[in-house]
């Protein structure tokens, strides 16, 4: 039996989880090697997105103005992350942002993680 894996990618307002915020979340969950669910949403960071980040990600303030804030998404995230190994390219970045967002809500995120950057460097 294969582990449950959720692939995650985030876009953010910058590189510092304590100061910056998530602007987009994309997830794909696999169970026994089969894709069972996928989800993507823009997230209102409740702060302005710097111009260079807008150019980098293509996400601007207008696009996120009516998007859910992070406090509206943990229930959905749980459906993808519970019981799964979270896989991301440079997982420290994505995991750090998720942990910071959960901390702002008074919660703790405990998640098993796997980094594709580390895997690729070992090949």
Residues of each region from the PLM?
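Short alpha-helix plus adjacent loop in nuclease-associated cores
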Residues: 100-103, 113-123
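Conserved non-catalytic scaffold segment of RNase H-like nuclease domains
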Residues: 1-111
